[in-house]
Amino acid sequence: MKKKRTHKSRILLTGLILISFIAVNFSYTAASELTLEQILDRVEKHYTGKNFQAEFIQESTIKAMDIVDFASGKIFVRYPGMMRWEYEKPEKQIIITDGHKLWIYRPSDNQVLTGSAPAFFSDGKGASFLSDIKLIRQKFKISLENSKEGFFHELKLQPLEKRLDVIDIRLSVTKNTFTVIRIITYNSYGDENRIEFANHQFDVKLDESLFSFEIPPGADVVQLDE
């Protein structure tokens, strides 16, 4: 029942995203003629040095087990390197990094998983490049794909260093604002992690305390990198 409600919410929110883009502007001819380098320049200009927050919907598919999970919440990003993911559905969970340390807190279990942020957010995992967009050019081979949806530039990112957990990342970038509204990550097993963003707010004031975490008394603490 929860999955059905989450899936319904995802459909409604995706519809709102598309309607908002249709209403903004139809003058995409010039934008569609941009080169890959020009698109990357504009994306970097849009994100570099800026804080932002947005809502997200996540769909994770484990191919071998035929499992599809849905989740939603809010993301907060402070440049450079700081992120906070607040999952609200199907259950509350917080993922926080200050660029150095990582905390994952599950209130229902009173459990905290902690470790080194670079070990878990390297090479684009967890959409980490959103906190420092210039990492895209440094870490990936990038190509411009044909878009099935006329509102977006579709970018294909392949890690320069081969790895099993991330072999391919697809970015959907709006043609009018150069905002990343969809990230799809694939691994070598054919699993897919799709994140869609909406209601972006840029240049917001995000206190540094949002990106640190104080472990609650009595919490079960698990070291991820041991």
PLM-predicted stretches and their roles:
Residues 74-124, 193-194:
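An acidic-aromatic
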Residues 135-225:
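Gly/Pro-enriched, hydrophobic low-complexity segments
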Residues 54-57, 72, 85, 197:
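Extended beta-sheet lipid-handling architectures
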Residues 32-40, 44-62, 66-68, 96, ...:
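Flexible, processing/modification-adjacent segments and terminal tails
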Residues 2-16:
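Bacterial N-terminal signal peptides that target proteins for export
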Residues 23-33:
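Bacterial Sec-dependent signal peptides at the C-terminal "C-region" and cleavage site
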